[in-house]
């Protein structure tokens, strides 16, 4: 969605698109080595499907949410470099045959893909249902269509709490703290002392990104 702003007639690289609080120049600073798949234009296209993301609350809260999302994306993708999960040995483990819909794309088809590394057959089913795309039968769309890839990450961020007690979106807009976003995304593996180095990686990137956007990181950064 584009918004006409009379005081911002120029959509140059320093101007946020629409009402997104991160400009393309800032995005490129965050992801200097990114794969072209993770484009700013694909992200801003995906945002139209999630109108509450980084638009809720004060300017500081909006920037904190954008920074938190992009910091987690940076961690999950190695700085926007990796589109698919690098450990191929894990690929067959993401099929939960206990689900009534099974794994129609194959047992090894539901590996991590995209900005937040969507994995498991049930997550592909739920994301696809929400986005109106059959990701259960065609999970490869998440590694081939960059807008769909960004949408799956935003879907997870705004609707899924994982092992946590709230979604990452709720954690940021209600100022519960960045640590809750880590728990929602990968709490089983990283939180409660399981992998402090991974947690620190996410926190450090979040602190860098909030500084870049000119806001404070807030409290409760760890999980």
Annotated model-derived regions:
Residues 17-42, 55-56, 64-156, 177, ...:
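Peptidoglycan-targeting cell-wall enzymes and recognition modules
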Residues 136, 141-210:
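Extracellular low-complexity, Gly/Ser/Thr-rich intrinsically disordered linkers
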Residues 44-48:
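Alpha-helical tetratricopeptide repeat
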Residues 52-65, 81-86, 164-176, 217-221:
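Surface-exposed patches in mature extracellular/periplasmic domains of secreted proteins
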Residues 11-16:
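Extracellular fibronectin type III
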Residues 205-218, 222-223:
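Substrate-binding and catalytic surfaces of secreted/luminal carbohydrate-active proteins
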């Amino acid at each position: 969605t584009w918004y006409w702003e009379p005081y911002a007639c120029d959509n140059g690289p320093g101007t946020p698109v629409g009402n997104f609080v991160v400009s393309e120049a800032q995005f490129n600073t965050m992801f200097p080595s990114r794969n072209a798949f993770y484009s700013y234009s694909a992200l801003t296209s995906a945002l139209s499907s999630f109108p509450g993301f980084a638009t809720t609350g004060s300017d500081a809260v909006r920037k904190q949410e954008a920074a938190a999302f992009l910091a987690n994306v940076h961690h999950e993708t190695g700085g926007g470099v990796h589109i698919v999960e690098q450990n191929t040995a894990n690929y067959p483990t993401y099929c939960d045959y206990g689900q009534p819909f099974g794994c129609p794309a194959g047992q090894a088809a539901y590996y991590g893909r995209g900005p937040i590394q969507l994995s498991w057959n049930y997550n592909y089913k739920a994301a696809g249902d929400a986005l109106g795309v059959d990701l259960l039968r065609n999970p490869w769309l998440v590694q081939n269509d960059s807008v769909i890839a960004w949408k799956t990450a935003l879907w997870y961020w705004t609707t899924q709490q994982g092992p946590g007690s709230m979604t990452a979106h709720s954690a940021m807009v209600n100022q519960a703290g960045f640590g809750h976003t880590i728990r929602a995304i990968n709490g089983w593996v990283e939180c409660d002392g399981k992998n402090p180095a991974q947690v620190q990686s996410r926190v450090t990137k979040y602190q860098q990104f909030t500084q870049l956007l000119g806001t404070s990181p807030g409290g409760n950064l760890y999980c």
